[in-house]
Amino acid sequence: MATDRRRVLPVLLLVAVVAGGLAAIPRQDDYAGARRRMIEEIRARRDVTDPAVLAALEAVPRHLFVPEKERRNSYEDRPLSIGLGQTISQPYMVALMTSLLGVHRGQRVLEIGTGSGYQAAVLSRMGVEVYSIEIVKRLGERARRTLSEQGYHKVHLRIGDGYEGWPSAAPFDGIIVTAAPPRIPDPLLSQLKTGARMVIPVGNSYQDLWVLTRRRDGGFDRRRVLPVLFVPMTGEAQKRER
């Protein structure tokens, strides 16, 4: 069947223009592919195998938790600046710490150091109720806005010093700390349920990631996981070091 070339040519030109414009703009599908590649890289390291953790990381749009200028790098396995001297942890570290926490749907977790809100979003995606504290007001307000816009309504965010934890909401099924104090804050230990874990980086120039599990007798089993580098915990933690 013959075709009128005069009608086809404008259509082809329009398609070419639209396609050319879209090529310059990252699409949601592009980010989805980048997330899948990020998950494949994490799986390849073989120390994060929890399907719920990996599914949450694949579902949460990390690019929406970083500044616009960092979005092209948002699924690379490295920390990124979120401004005000703070960073968003590398995806592998988020996966590892979440896996070490060992929490499940319906449980409650205290997070010290909301930052961008990404770690809280991952936990919320797993069905965990999150209580998160951020000491930097502007970061906390930005994270609250992002979490609300993305529909993460099981995150309770408070702006303040996280050293004392959140006593009125304690005890928790897990505590995750995303800034390094010189030593482990005793108030946080007291807010763990029996059998619950705290995952925390500890140290000054040299830091290690630790997992502490509360025993029935009130003591703690302590396990050092690996050397890490986190931003320091500010506020009361720094005052007590002087």
Positions of predicted regions on the chain:
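Positively charged
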Residues: 174, 239-242
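Conserved nucleotide-cofactor-binding alpha/beta core module
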Residues: 102-221
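N-terminal secretory signal peptides that target proteins for export/translocation
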Residues: 1-4
